[in-house]
């Protein structure tokens, strides 16, 4: 299935206002079985209000922390990368993944960065559910 990735408009504003620091804040990813995106989603409370978080063996509500997070710049392009998030020994069905800044500590203060539409429901059954990060990064920002 083809995955499509979308950056939340509010994320760009939050970065510009220094409300999130992608190189030092705690970043996480959560899975959803259903979700309807809106440009107005500014917090994880908004995101959860428009979707159904996945559940199942091996999955904890709120998702998991991203590991090996790096923010690097080459020329005019800044890239956020991380290791592939994986839930081992899990039984999960998900159609969306939401990556977010968890520095706020609560759904009302945690800030969404981007979401993936997995192109349909992906599942694991007593196996590993993995999100494969594109070789060019999770998110890229290009200066003119």
What spans do the regions from the language model cover?
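Small cysteine-rich, disulfide-bonded extracellular modules of the LU/uPAR three-finger superfamily
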Residues: 1-95, 102-144
